[in-house]
Every structure is written in C-alpha cells, then in structure tokens.
Amino acid sequence: MSKKTIYFLCTGNSCRSQMAEGWAKKHLGDEWNVYSAGIEAHGLNPNAVKAMREAGIDISEQTSDIIDPDILHNADLVITLCGDAADKCPMTPPHVKREHWGFDDPAKAEGTEEEKWAFFQRVRDEIGERIKRFAETGE
C-alpha cells in the first residue's frame, strides 16, 4: 500500500508547521509522507528545534520551505495551522482534503525569556497531542 501525503502549512514554516512535521513523522511516518511549508520561508526557529529536542524529536535537519504546488495538489490531506495560512493558502483541488487546526504562534510570545519558553513548550505539546489524536482516531 502506498503512503498517503499530509502537508502542514503556516505563515513562515518556522515554528508550528515544523513542530507538526516532527510530531507527524513520529506518529504517522509509517503510513504518511509528511511535509511542511509556509506562505513564506522564515527559517527554522531555534526555539522550535530546542522544544522538540526536549520532547525527544530532532527537527534540526528540517528545512523552511515555501508551498510547493506539486505537493499541495497531490496531497491527501492539507492542514493549516494558523489563520493567515488558512486565508492565504492557494486553492487546493477538490480531491485534496483540507482542515484547519489553529494554534497560537510561539514566535509572537511576549514576556520574560521563561514565559516565552513556556509558550513554546505549550504549543509544542498542543500540536503533539492533536497529531497523536489524529494518529489514533483519524480525526
């Protein structure tokens, strides 16, 4: 059986979609080809790498990419992770299922360094739980 393709999209392919790609490779990698991209490519956020490493997942080799029309049009499932991506994502063909799983942007966290770091950890855990639920239930 060939693998299905899941494509995670957010604004800059820097934090949320990168963490989603890492979690999905862990929980869905046997059944899905996992990709992520952004409306723009802002580069991999070092705190996203650090947060995922803390959870035992290495995303340091992932790249920050803009949306690839070939992957977008051939994906089985496209998931937007922020309102900006949901609004600006290019049209997907009717056969491509599209869902929106909204998460706060950890790159916009304010406060002390500890508060910003806690924000990254929270969003990391929320994305991980959502992907784990999808892996277990298909929803």
UniProtKB/Swiss-Prot annotation:
Catalytic activity: arsenate + [thioredoxin]-dithiol + H(+) = arsenite + [thioredoxin]-disulfide + H2O
Biological process per Gene Ontology, one example term: response to arsenic-containing substance
Active-site annotation: C10 (nucleophile), C82 (nucleophile), C89 (nucleophile)
Cysteines joined through disulfide linkages: C10-C82, C82-C89
A single GO molecular function term of this UniProt record: protein tyrosine phosphatase activity
EC number: 1.20.4.4
Chain segments annotated as coiled-coil in the UniProt record: none
Keyword terms of this UniProt record: Arsenical resistance, Cytoplasm, Disulfide bond, Oxidoreductase, Redox-active center
GO cellular component: cytoplasm
Keyword Oxidoreductase found: yes
Domain of life: Bacteria
Matches recorded under SMART domains: LMWPc (SM00226)
Pfam family, one: LMWPc
Protein family (similarity comment): Belongs to the low molecular weight phosphotyrosine protein phosphatase family. Thioredoxin-coupled ArsC subfamily.
Function description: Catalyzes the reduction of arsenate [As(V)] to arsenite [As(III)].
Protein name (record): Arsenate reductase
Organism: Bacillus licheniformis (strain ATCC 14580 / DSM 13 / JCM 2505 / CCUG 7422 / NBRC 12200 / NCIMB 9375 / NCTC 10341 / NRRL NRS-1264 / Gibson 46)
